[in-house]
């Protein structure tokens, strides 16, 4: 069993015993469910020379039950000191409990990594629960820019993380293929089509899409229809162009996502919701629940009275679910609003029977959070669904020290394809995970082309390559040691230097780290972990290169060499597993 999992279970047993004893001496009923409300958090040490693992459980219990945290910490120490795998326990600060684990417990864990059984520690966390993750969902009005890549990679890697930990995952893209923006897209394409037919450069009015990427769509229309569309009325040619434009741009979006290894299982059409009369049925359902009414909205803050005309309209009572205002369900022309479409779409997700529904939104959609929560609360009658909304903050593309501004409307943006052609898939995917999703990310094109520590994917891949080179060299030059290693007869207790043990301790935290990453929907933890593992391995490599006593291959000591080959293999195994989840190539030679 993983060291962290075993320690957590044993702390839980002791915590339950302590809490029950405190409950028995208290008349307060507020402590009845205390065991369920106090999480046991284990942190690996930042100072490996003093302890291995720390927990603040005594401080949490003390705060909840009005006790002295130092006294409780010492009680934990007394009860846990007898466990055979724990070498030492110390109390620090206001009640942190610091554990030193027996050295052989760490070294023995290498066998679990080498035989692959470590995966069992997290492969059933999800218990086959169904998860829907919606990510990207950019309007099909133009190519995806590098800012979209962040949500794309975050969603794709989160899906992979959930799958490898036992969840059933549906990757989804909501296609906004109707409404004003699609009308404007069709008008823009028509002007490009006209340009192709007449040879005269189109003048694109403000509010439309001026990007030259639409010329190719205009060319396709010209090949299929000749000049026929020029003879049709605007409603007639727009109806034709809308479908062609959306289909072409959606195919372009799919192709760009494929470049960086991002895929979706479902592309859900908003237009189909309108065409199938589903929206009306869902609104009727909310009307029965008395969540819909006819009324007037207040004048929006900051809007001039000259531009505001109050009108009676159909509204959803989203404020009773915590939204800051009720939401319109219909436009002035009587057609359904975007919000009404969102309600029908959410209802569809609920009916598909998901246990978790995750929305991944860009920073410009933060205002949607309260609306989505209101919709789910209104529709999920039995509260069976766990909703989570994740915001992906901005990506600042840096070129030569200057931030590049991006806008589809202005036609000035750096596409995913542009960046892919410079740095490739692996760099894009890894770097998008080097910070938590809700933190702004600077994407420096110059640094990410370097073969240095500033290029994190190179740094991790290079650790994998270096470890592999050790094995190849040993196979050719240390046959006896390689035979001991390859027949699983390595003596891990020979790995006794401080640096070797530090590396093993990082390897052993993999499953614990992954458990936290999936439960908090934080795949960036994998990238951060891999960088730490690579750094520790490179440090050991450099030490062994300069000191005969630290070399991986010691020609006069086959048993020590075999143990160090096992350590190098364990490093490769965990890096391979981490890169597999992130969707990055493991290279053998650099």
UniProtKB/Swiss-Prot annotation:
It holds the Pfam family tRNA-synt_1d. The keyword Cell wall biogenesis/degradation does not apply. One of its GO terms (cellular component) is cytoplasm. The keyword Nuclease does not apply. InterPro entries: aa-tRNA-synth_I_CS, Arg-tRNA-ligase, Arg-tRNA-synth_N, Arg-tRNA-synth_N_sf, ArgRS_core, DALR_anticod-bd, Rossmann-like_a/b/a_fold, tRNAsynth_Ia_anticodon-bd. GO terms for molecular function: arginine-tRNA ligase activity; ATP binding. A motif ('HIGH' region) lies at residues 138-148. Its main location: cytoplasm. It catalyses: tRNA(Arg) + L-arginine + ATP = L-arginyl-tRNA(Arg) + AMP + diphosphate. It comes from the Bacteria. Its EC number is 6.1.1.19. It is found in: Cytoplasm. SUPFAM superfamilies: Anticodon-binding domain of a subclass of class I aminoacyl-tRNA synthetases, Arginyl-tRNA synthetase (ArgRS), N-terminal 'additional' domain, Nucleotidylyl transferase. GO terms for biological process: arginyl-tRNA aminoacylation. Keywords: Aminoacyl-tRNA synthetase, ATP-binding, Cytoplasm, Ligase, Nucleotide-binding, Protein biosynthesis. PROSITE patterns: AA_TRNA_LIGASE_I (PS00178). Monomer. Belongs to the class-I aminoacyl-tRNA synthetase family. This is Arginine--tRNA ligase. The gene is argS.
